[in-house]
Amino acid sequence: MIKRQKDRKFELVSKFKPAGDQQQAINKLTAGFEKGYKEQILEGATGTGKTFTMANIIAKLNKPTLVITHNKTLVGQLYGEFKGFFPNNAVEYFVSYYDYYQPEAYVPQSDTYIEKDSAINDEIDQLRHATTSALMERNDVIVVASVSCIYGLGDPKEYARSVLMIHEGQEYERNTLLRDLVNLQYDRNDIDFQRGRFRVRGDVVEIFPAGNSNHAYRVEFFGDEIDRIVEIDSLTGEVIGERESISLFPATHFMTNDEQLRRALKAISKEMKVQVKKFEGEGKLLEAERIKQRTTYDMEMMGEVGYTNGIENYSRHMEGRKVGEPPYTLLDFFPDDFLILIDESHATMPEIRAMYNGDRNRKKTLIDYGFRLPSALDNRPLKLAEFEKHVNQILYVSATPGDYELERTDHKVEQIIRPTGLLDPKIEVRPIEGQIDDLVGEINKRIDRNERVFVTTLTKKMAEDLTDYLKDLGIKVRYLHSDIKTLERMQILRDLRLGKFDVLIGINLLREGIDVPEVSLVAILDADKEGFLRAYRPLVQTMGRAARNANGEVIMYADTITDSMKAAIEATQRRRKLQEEFNKEHGIVPKTIIKPVHDVISITKPSEDSKKEKTDSFADLNFDELTAKQKKTMIKNLQEQMKEAAKKLDFEEAANLRDAIMELQSSSRRPKTRKGKALNGKR
């Protein structure tokens, strides 16, 4: 079995030193964990450099670390930042490897069975394998993950037992190596050399590990002895360097042996008979026949080829778990003494809590109607209580920690001072009567100063009406809403920053990627209408959009001051006062953040001859006017751009490209119903 190296240290590389009150936060939180505190909170205002603080804590504690956040875009951003902070350590990326996923489901009302359909992203699968192999080999590992890390991943002990370690001079027959590779789920293919495959050329075996992106190994034999091991470029075959020894990890996380498979098939057969008998006793003959046919077919497939579509539904039997026992997840691959950082904890923890119930409700219907055995319920994400049992030490990080975190621990550290000296925005409450005329006056002031404005409304109709009204007044305005596609959204934000329009109206401007330094005014209409979008945390998050500009201001239009408004205003004013005192003491003058405006991702690929080729923006396209060939070409170009972005570690751009590809693929499958450009949500 492979042994983990334990003597590696985290090495933080940065031209910056902790500034503002980052150092006190780093010291307090590090000391707390060293004292044995299990749970702590970092309440850091927007723009105070919470990620840099997290990096310093990781370096000081020197423990394997799992960073979890609630969506893939944020995972990509954090991965890129940590990769930059720790270039000499293992920083890994772990998200769901599905580009497209339609879960198996049944709708009783219409008697509709929806079969599971999915498309796996090969690059993300490689990154997942790189994650688990790094966790097995070394202790200086940071894994940045989405909540998919609480889903089943296979038994880490069986995975570790399966690792094949070979070294130069070892007595090892070539054919024995080939059999061992097949047992590790590697495929032999002498022509198409890809991850998880090997090829044979006389006494030379070339192996492309599942966790590598472009490097493979060449193992050269002399008789029954390994004569030489070299690392090669998988595409060109160029030798990169010689290796004394290598560890070959399985090509799948779900490793099983023949004995386990025999036991599993026996247990599945037994459960099937019990379920058939139950249905027959209830007079449900259709369900009884259905579960018998489906399960028998699956067992025959597993017996013949070791696999069947939906094999994960039998994971409890394959792994020998008891009824209700939690599945193995990424968390089980970590050593006992590890650190968890929950980024944006106010959003991430509710998502971790919600995963189990959503999964269970869908599967319960499949079981009740004879599509799956009851054991399918144990192929699931962790329950919140099970997640908590995995926690050794955990840090919740948020500008607005949730009730869950605040109830779990009293150990809270604030980070209020921004290294840039920027203050929390000024806040003013004005009456609703005449709010639009007042807003127009404030917008014109910002336009005169070449600044931008965010306006947040409560309803889609109000946002649309306000957009039309401002346009009639000659104000350059756009409306951001949920119907707008990924790349069009990026184009809108870029155009706002470039000054192509001055006002952006939306219902929920809390989504990631909305930080625009040019925005000096955030106007919140109907601020006193209590609800999700006007609760304390969303209000604080919305106010934070004006915290990137030295002239940042928030105007809340309301006739009464609700408890949520009062709490949000008081919290912001308290922080602003502390920031002003700090700036005065240290002679700091706040300056607006200077952030370069990146080009929106192009749809057409520039030619080698001319880099000036015109490109279309995603916003200007009507998918229904494109031919199937045009869509295919566009998808291919976007896929190339996605791979290039991933190579440059720009995972935010890669994730946006992936979303755009999925939108194009989806438009290719659905019937044509749209007319005209999908701009501003109009049909």
From Swiss-Prot:
> Any idea where the Helicase ATP-binding domain is?
31-414
Q: Which domain of life is it from?
A: Bacteria
List the subcellular locations: Cytoplasm
Q: Return the annotated region ranges for Disordered.
A: 662-683
| GO biological process terms held by the UniProt record | nucleotide-excision repair; SOS response
Q: Quaternary structure?
A: Forms a heterotetramer with UvrA during the search for lesions. Interacts with UvrC in an incision complex.
Q: Under what name is this protein listed?
A: UvrABC system protein B
Question: Which organism does this sequence originate in?
Answer: Lactobacillus acidophilus (strain ATCC 700396 / NCK56 / N2 / NCFM)
Question: What taxonomic ancestry is recorded?
Answer: Bacteria, Bacillati, Bacillota, Bacilli, Lactobacillales
Whichever gene encodes this chain, its name is uvrB
